[in-house]
């Protein structure tokens, strides 16, 4: 009989969001008339920007002509989109990033997982705790961890706790690690990093030969102009970092699928024989072999994000969701709950009421208020006692959810 990948058997009971889905499904089956409000998974709700829709319509019409038809595109992405990304997202902020260093993809979740294809199995890995579960689970699937302990932490990983006690800022590891996952603005806590904090990570990585995997999927939600949007705003980051970005949350592409990864030329790792190897070439080879590129139509939609109209519409979407976050912060603070995040990210991180753990608070809100959120413990042991609410929903639903919770 064929053998399975035994690493999958090390995974805990279920990926966080499917487990939430299972509980919600069971509740809905038992309470078919309940009007649930979902503030859990970070999926957007507002329509795609008009500029993007019009660009995709034009691209569809072009595909119906002999002159405008496009088959397989470049695996790295069309040059015009890569140029727009480099100009607007990086060069405009003083980052030395060229179009050739940008790889367009169908999602930053995919890229942050697939990047392991080009990295060795013996790397020592550091993640924050709490953490976006994909970083941990993909390393488990790839056989880069041991078994999970009683708290759910996997052997072989270095966990860096973040909580209110340390201002949600992970401490630099006391021992050398090879691979460091950082996410700012942070999912799930909503915390942000200053340039000084990122510089400390870059300095550590350069001193120890480490690689930072920097997830900037929520950078568009930063409100303070002094805060960095990219790791490449930090001097020396080209020598030690790869960055993941997405159009999902700022432009509403969760169902449309377009993202990109930045791999600087000159960024190197080490082969088993000690030889220095450029990661750009390995990632380019990986993408050329395993990926056929993002649809021409979708890339035209993403390009429109950088038009004047697209930029204005994206700003409007970001402002809308951040207004939702402000409502959640204000209403729940007024209800006596301790609130973090929600100022530079679309996530509000809540301290659960005394005597209630994360899943207990989840069940409490589901059963008593018919509101779905995300238990903090699902993001790691240090998330126990916290709870995440997402600002991605309609204003009417956010207002209704707050009224229900305050009435408890």
From Swiss-Prot:
Its EC number is 2.6.1.83. It is an enzyme of class 2 (transferase). It catalyses: (2S,6S)-2,6-diaminopimelate + 2-oxoglutarate = (S)-2,3,4,5-tetrahydrodipicolinate + L-glutamate + H2O + H(+). The keyword Phosphoprotein does not apply. Keywords: Aminotransferase, Pyridoxal phosphate, Transferase. Pathway: Amino-acid biosynthesis; L-lysine biosynthesis via DAP pathway; LL-2,6-diaminopimelate from (S)-tetrahydrodipicolinate (aminotransferase route): step 1/1. Its cofactor is pyridoxal 5'-phosphate. This is LL-diaminopimelate aminotransferase. It comes from Parasynechococcus marenigrum (strain WH8102).
């Amino acid at each position: 009989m064929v053998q399975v990948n035994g690493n999958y058997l090390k995974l805990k009971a279920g990926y966080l969001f499917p487990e939430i889905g299972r509980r919600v499904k069971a509740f809905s089956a038992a309470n078919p008339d309940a009007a649930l409000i979902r503030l859990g998974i970070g999926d957007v709700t507002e329509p795609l920007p008009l500029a993007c829709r019009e660009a995709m319509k034009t691209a569809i019409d072009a595909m119906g002509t002999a002159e405008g038809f496009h088959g397989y595109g470049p695996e790295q992405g069309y040059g015009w989109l890569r140029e727009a990304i480099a100009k607007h997202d990086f060069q405009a902020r003083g980052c030395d990033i060229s179009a050739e260093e940008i790889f367009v993809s169908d999602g930053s979740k995919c890229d942050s997982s697939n990047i392991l294809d080009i990295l060795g199995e013996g790397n020592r890995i550091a993640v924050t705790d709490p953490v976006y579960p994909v970083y941990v689970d993909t390393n488990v699937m790839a056989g880069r961890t041991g078994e999970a302990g009683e708290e759910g932490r996997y052997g072989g990983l270095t966990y860096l706790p973040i909580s209110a006690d340390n201002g949600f800022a992970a401490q630099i590891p006391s021992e050398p690690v090879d691979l460091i996952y950082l996410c700012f603005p942070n999912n799930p806590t909503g915390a942000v990093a200053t340039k000084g904090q990122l510089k400390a990570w870059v300095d550590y990585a350069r001193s120890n030969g480490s690689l930072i995997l920097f997830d900037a999927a929520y950078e568009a939600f930063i409100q303070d102009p002094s805060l960095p949007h990219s790791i490449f705003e930090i001097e020396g980051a080209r020598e030690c970092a790869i960055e993941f970005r997405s159009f999902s949350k700022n432009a509403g592409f969760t169902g449309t699928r377009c993202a990109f990864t930045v791999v600087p030329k000159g960024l190197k790792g080490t082969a088993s024989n000690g030889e220095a190897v450029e990661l750009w070439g390995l990632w380019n080879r990986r993408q050329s072999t395993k990926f056929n590129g993002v649809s021409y139509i979708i890339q035209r939609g993403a390009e429109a994000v950088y038009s004047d109209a697209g930029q204005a519409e994206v700003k409007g979407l970001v402002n809308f969701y951040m207004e939702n976050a402000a409502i959640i912060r204000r209403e729940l603070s007024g209800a006596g709950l301790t609130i973090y995040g929600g100022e530079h990210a679309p996530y509000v991180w809540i301290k659960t009421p005394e005597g209630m753990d994360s899943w207990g608070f989840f069940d409490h809100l589901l059963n008593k208020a018919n509101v779905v959120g995300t238990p903090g413990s699902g993001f790691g042991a240090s998330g126990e006692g916290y709870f995440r609410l997402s600002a991605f929903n309609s204003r009417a639903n956010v207002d209704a959810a707050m009224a229900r919770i305050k009435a408890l």
